[in-house]
């Protein structure tokens, strides 16, 4: 009897391990395929469909994503993006060492990198509470793998195609059409900054009608765009794949 029970336990263990192996293998195949194809759908997009927001998206190629929206995304979300390995270790260390009662609650303190946001949006799920902590280990893994396999250009391309930029609106192209009735490639610097300003909570911080937060944040993003535009690594990433006519114009707004 004891031998049968031990045999059953080993059998269940083998089944579970086999299931985990095939799940891991399938996820790796999907990750490699997404180096060349856009994700067919994400959990956040499924959530939009189920909630009644609909699904407005228009995936575009890297050379159709303008320099100013690339620059605005990095200026707002991850200024170290061209240089890090997927993680902002200094911010992580600072976040872990800060007394939770005294943490700076401003947006950006301990924020995820663009690479982490892509890993979360494409392969995992959104949400806080206990699900946030359950997600951390696979998020670390997928972030490491896309940095290794995709590279910076592809990560930023996917980010600017799949990130939610309004209720049911996904990607810069769909946002440009929804808010300004024009393709993303025709966006002005101010319009690009306005679209990015709705992140990370586009349902609360709306572009149209323009929330007070978006009004403030887009001006901050424009200043940051001016400050980082001449960084050689950022400039290279902003200009990659674009013709001379599509490259960023000199920022003319005033600081302040």
Residue ranges and their predicted role:
Residues 2-256:
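Juxtamembrane regions of bacterial inner-membrane/periplasmic proteins
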């Amino acid at each position: 009897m004891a031998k049968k029970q031990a045999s059953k336990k080993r059998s269940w263990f083998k089944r579970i391990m086999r299931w985990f192996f095939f799940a891991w293998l399938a996820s790796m195949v999907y990750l490699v395929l997404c180096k060349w194809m856009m994700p067919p759908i994400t959990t956040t997009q499924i959530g939009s469909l189920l909630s009644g927001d609909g699904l407005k998206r228009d995936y575009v190629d890297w050379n159709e994503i303008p320099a100013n929206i690339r620059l605005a995304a990095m200026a707002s979300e991850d200024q170290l993006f061209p240089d890090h390995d997927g993680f902002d270790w200094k911010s992580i260390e600072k976040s872990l060492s800060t007394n939770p009662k005294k943490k700076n609650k401003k947006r950006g303190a301990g924020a995820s990198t663009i690479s982490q946001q892509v890993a979360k949006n494409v392969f995992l799920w959104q949400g806080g509470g206990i699900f946030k902590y359950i997600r951390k280990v696979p998020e670390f893994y997928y972030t490491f793998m896309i940095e290794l396999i995709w590279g910076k250009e592809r990560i930023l391309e996917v980010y600017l195609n799949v990130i939610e930029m309004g209720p049911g609106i996904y990607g810069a192209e769909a946002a440009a059409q929804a808010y300004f009735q024009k393709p993303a490639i025709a966006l002005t610097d101010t319009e690009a900054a306005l679209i990015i300003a709705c992140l990370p909570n586009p349902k609360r911080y709306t572009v149209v009608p323009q929330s007070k937060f978006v009004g403030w944040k887009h001006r901050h993003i424009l200043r940051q765009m001016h400050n980082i535009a001449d960084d050689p690594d950022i400039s290279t990433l902003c200009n990659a794949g674009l013709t001379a006519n599509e490259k960023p114009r000199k920022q003319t707004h005033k600081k302040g």
